[in-house]
Amino acid sequence: MKKILLLGSGELGKEFVISAQRKGQHVIACDSYAGAPAMQVADEFEVFDMLDGEALERVVEKHHPDIIVPEIEAIRTERLYDFEKEGIQVVPSARAVNFTMNRKAIRDLAAKELGLKTANYFYAKTLDELKEAAAKIGFPCVVKPLMSSSGKGQSLVKSADELEHAWEYGCSGSRGDIRELIIEEFIKFDSEITLLTVTQKNGPTLFCPPIGHVQKGGDYRESFQPAHIDPAHLKEAEEMAEKVTRALTGAGLWGVEFFLSHENGVYFSELSPRPHDTGMVTLAGTQNLNEFELHLRAVLGLPIPGIKQERIGASAVILSPIASQERPQYRGMEEVTKEEDTYLRIFGKPFTRVNRRMGVVLCYAPLNSDLDALRDKAKRIAEKVEVY
């Protein structure tokens, strides 16, 4: 049995904890608020600000974990190097977590060091720098914080008149203490995919069937698997994913995102060194091993006999229309559970924000079924659930 310190306790962390406990592991779930989803199923929990390096060190000293598994971006990541030197396994590695928590580090690694094709981009520390960069890139363009999650602070800017708002919105959505934005050209893509990539301690890099997804405001709204893409584009995406994960080092599951264009090919977008929100579709049994089981096996060094597509799947998120500190209630579960070949996951978040992701509907069907119809089904069912 290993003692695992989970940094971040959202819905992805909750599913990881469930997988870990099924393999007899001991998990301490951490987050900045009590009652977070993963805490509800963990052996122990800690509530503290993970951007506070001293608080993080105190928790590590208290629990003496064998493994540290980051689940969110807002962590004092430079401390992870020290923990790794002390013999604690950081997943997938301290280098990987440190690079990917900051869009500047990962974009420069991908574009400048590894030569991956990306959108043209600049950085801006002031509004004036943002205006200068926009003049070079042109409109429309995309403005994002260097550190954020779930699309927070991200905007599509269509004219110079919108830059001041984009600057303020970007800074307000930034996680951590970094006040710098990335501005990038808007790629006219036909689709975007997540390629779940598994790096192992002993074994080859593995890839899950590609996951298509739809975002709104930079935040995941639906995903489906397998995404139907050009085999040549898939091969190119796999080569890019293997290149960047190898450079970052370590064992675990990664969510590597790409833009696909019939005209211009494959563009690397970004990656997360952990299970991905769009990968929740694998909870519909689309694969022989879902993304959380794959992550756990890679972390523990357990064999992965291969990844097989078992059936098609689609997910659609359930959002909160309200903001409240009261524990949320849900209507419509009876209607949802009448549906065949459908799972409902309510994450158990103790309070709401407007558009906060509170649950997900997962639908599945046999291979070679109509994927578009399945996507429509998942969205229709998700709309039946009301958060109040």
Curated annotation (Swiss-Prot):
GO terms for cellular component: cytosol. Gene3D superfamilies: 3.40.50.20, ATP-grasp fold, A domain (3.30.1490.20), ATP-grasp fold, B domain (3.30.470.20). One of its GO terms (biological process) is 'de novo' IMP biosynthetic process. N(1)-(5-phospho-beta-D-ribosyl)glycinamide binds at residues 11-12, 71, 277, 349, 356-357. It catalyses: N(1)-(5-phospho-beta-D-ribosyl)glycinamide + formate + ATP = N(2)-formyl-N(1)-(5-phospho-beta-D-ribosyl)glycinamide + ADP + phosphate + H(+). Residues 108-300 form the ATP-grasp domain. Keywords: ATP-binding, Ligase, Magnesium, Metal-binding, Nucleotide-binding, Purine biosynthesis. Homodimer. This is Formate-dependent phosphoribosylglycinamide formyltransferase. It comes from Bacteroides thetaiotaomicron (strain ATCC 29148 / DSM 2079 / JCM 5827 / CCUG 10774 / NCTC 10582 / VPI-5482 / E50). The gene is purT.
